[in-house]
Amino acid sequence: MQLDFRNINTLWSSIIVETLSRLGLTTAVICPGSRSTPLTVAFASHSKIDTIPILDERSAAFFALGIAKRTHLPVALICTSGTAGANFYPAVIEGKESQVPLLIFTADRPPELRNCHAGQTIDQVKLYGNYCNWYIELSLPSVEIRLLSYLRQTIIAAWDHALVPYKGIVHLNCPFREPLAPIIEPNIASLCTEVNFDNFFLNIYESNKKRLRTDYLYDHLNHWLSQANGIIIAGVGNSNNTDLYCNQIFRLSTLLNYPVLAEALCPFRNHAQGFPNLINTYDILLRNQKLADELVPDVVIQIGEFPTSKQLREWLTHHQVQHWVIDSRPDSLDPLHNNTYYIRTDIHDLEMEYNKQCIPGKQDLSYLQQWKKINKIINRNIKTTLDKTNELIEAKLPFILSKNLQDKTSIFIANSMPVRYAEFFWMPNKGQFMPYFNRGANGIEGTLSTALGVAYKAKSSLLITGDLALLHDTNGWLIRQHFQGHLTIILINNNGGGIFEMLPIAKEESVFESYFATPQNINFSQLCSTYNVEHILIKNWTQLKRLLNPLPSTGIRVLELQTDRKKDALWLQDNMKKLSMIDNK
């Protein structure tokens, strides 16, 4: 037990931290500031909590988000009063939308210093609006045992709200009066003997609450089993148990004889061994109108978020197929607005009771076999085309990575074009790679900081990013002095926003380059030198492969691929339809 009896603020803050430690908190990210001094001292002094100081609040929040993405446990995030907490907002939005648990502690002035132009004071009450699972303003610190008990129970409640019924953001606003530094107040020290704090912390342990399953999958199986033509969509999702995730989907697919259309931003493509019903080429396939018409399903079972693919969205929107979504969140996860039924549970939590009650899988395999045959041909087309492509084009990068990384590498894929190229060309493999991403709100802010959080104290990791997303978060490199682990950054430098080359606005030459592509003309070698980050310019695919396996165990480095975004866009325009041609092979 690690309590600090030097004054009322140190005791209050150390009870917060000790309670969190007993609940399972292991990591806190702290931004510098005066009003948060009691919290900073308490977190930094606790031997069981890893505390990382980060200057920039926006970067700090995304770094914490990255750690929480990897560990699936809450990370504490601490800042001072005023605008500091406002800089957390982009990461708060992403955390809410992608179900990542964070405990945010914003220090604040006491009530008598609000609304009177006291320095560094803003209205922090419900600062993050509806993006929190829970918000509370703590009372001012007190030594009354009744209020200390209130504090303990409130922290326990905050931990639970960050995890159940679904993961997300909890905001605790924490007012403090002076003294903020750990100046000794003799009357506080006597509490050490007056109160039995061993009993005070009894029965605090990591929550084992499980989500309630309000619906069971087998209630719907009879209908699914009666439909020969169905698909399972393994959508965007980050699993804390990839083997179970893949096995659950595999068992459902085997029972129903449905193909699994697996988004690159879920683990399924990287656990392809033994999963013969995996389909990775659906986006390309659906560009062939004849095939798209032939393969219209009667049933769609979506697991998690809908994939990135615009082709898949338009296909299912046009045909308005019966649609089921398996996900524990109370949100709508159907941007298509189909006739959708929600099974409000997590794919991991399904106990597969239905295997005991249902008939064996259907015998009509023609629909499944058609999907598998076409998928095999298109994969062959992709391999043939990209194997003979020696030029540094963005399309070949995910193809190379999916075949050459060391097993179990963590891969953070930035938004805009990297996630789309991954969906097109990330090949099925048995590497057990773990994809990470910020697809809650799909923004480019915080890309580098989140990736560093994912890589912190983990196995060697990889970030795939464009130049604009990296430039948007260069303050993330300030984390370098406290970073433990390794991150290789593959920088696709096409000097601007490649995704806009795919949109109709690209034809408007008078405004396109300055206002949409926004080239920054940065020398990344010099930029990396400023932050003391290793930089290597990639000149060919052979050089890149040599640097990928094995990855280093420590440090941060940038591998820069210089590409032409206009040529990349033209390549997609010229080749995607060709890749979908099967010619009855």
From Swiss-Prot:
It catalyses: isochorismate + 2-oxoglutarate + H(+) = 5-enolpyruvoyl-6-hydroxy-2-succinyl-cyclohex-3-ene-1-carboxylate + CO2. One of its GO terms (molecular function) is 2-succinyl-5-enolpyruvyl-6-hydroxy-3-cyclohexene-1-carboxylic-acid synthase activity. It comes from the Bacteria. Keywords: Magnesium, Manganese, Metal-binding, Thiamine pyrophosphate, Transferase. Its cofactor is Mg(2+); Mn(2+); thiamine diphosphate. The keyword Protease does not apply. Binds 1 thiamine pyrophosphate per subunit. Pathway: Quinol/quinone metabolism; 1,4-dihydroxy-2-naphthoate biosynthesis; 1,4-dihydroxy-2-naphthoate from chorismate: step 2/7; Cofactor biosynthesis; phylloquinone biosynthesis. Its EC number is 2.2.1.9. InterPro entries: MenaQ_synth_MenD, MenD_middle, THDP-binding, Thiamin_PyroP_enz_TPP-bd_dom, TPP_enzyme_TPP-bd. The keyword Lyase does not apply. GO terms for biological process: menaquinone biosynthetic process; phylloquinone biosynthetic process. Homodimer. Catalyzes the thiamine diphosphate-dependent decarboxylation of 2-oxoglutarate and the subsequent addition of the resulting succinic semialdehyde-thiamine pyrophosphate anion to isochorismate to yield 2-succinyl-5-enolpyruvyl-6-hydroxy-3-cyclohexene-1-carboxylate (SEPHCHC). Belongs to the TPP enzyme family. MenD subfamily. This is 2-succinyl-5-enolpyruvyl-6-hydroxy-3-cyclohexene-1-carboxylate synthase. It comes from Crocosphaera subtropica (strain ATCC 51142 / BH68) (Cyanothece sp. (strain ATCC 51142)). The lineage of its organism: Bacteria, Bacillati, Cyanobacteriota, Cyanophyceae, Oscillatoriophycideae.
